[in-house]
From Swiss-Prot:
Name recorded for this polypeptide: Predicted GPI-anchored protein 11
Organism field: Candida albicans (strain SC5314 / ATCC MYA-2876) (Yeast)
Keywords: Cell membrane, Glycoprotein, GPI-anchor, Lipoprotein, Membrane, Signal
Name of the gene encoding the protein in the UniProt record: PGA11
Induction trigger: Up-regulated upon milbemycins A3 oxim derivative (A3Ox) treatment.
Lipid attachment residues per UniProt (GPI-anchor amidated serine): S107
Subcellular location: Cell membrane
Domain of life: Eukaryota
Renumbered residue ranges of the record's region Disordered: 38-59
UniProt GO cellular component terms: plasma membrane; side of membrane
Membrane topology: Lipid-anchor; GPI-anchor
């Protein structure tokens, strides 16, 4: 007798829990009025529009398309890092570049000065 009661109770609770699932899907469909762009199939132009770079205070920043204050701050840090790193890369870069090679003997001092100026001017 006890086994039958437990079985009947388990069956009843399963039916009670399973019944609202179909109703929940209808409710969720009514509640979720907004649709994701990807849900209906996006065009390439929409995806590109979502992926525009965020400009920072010092020019181009990150390329993730973050918007709002957080995105602006991230882009500003990124653009500041690029602004500082550009002249340093120019100074440390090997080779003559615009400073000349000093003939066939290698870069020499003239090449280093050329890297210095091209690095500084390239960062501006």
């Amino acid at each position: 007798m006890k086994f039958q009661f437990v079985t009947a109770l388990a069956l009843a609770s399963t039916m009670a829990v399973a019944a609202p699932i179909n109703d929940q899907q209808e409710v969720l469909g009514a509640v979720a009025a907004t649709r994701s762009k990807r849900e209906g199939g996006s065009t390439g132009a929409e995806l590109q529009d979502n992926n525009q770079p965020t400009a920072g205070l010092f020019g181009d920043g990150n390329s993730f398309g973050n918007q709002g204050l957080g995105g602006f701050l991230a882009a500003t840090v990124d653009s500041l890092t690029k602004t500082i790193a550009s002249p340093i890369k120019g100074i440390l870069a090997p080779g003559g570049g615009s400073g000349g090679n000093g003939g066939s003997g290698g870069s020499g001092a003239a090449g280093g000065v050329g890297n210095l100026f091209s690095g500084i001017l390239g960062g501006l």
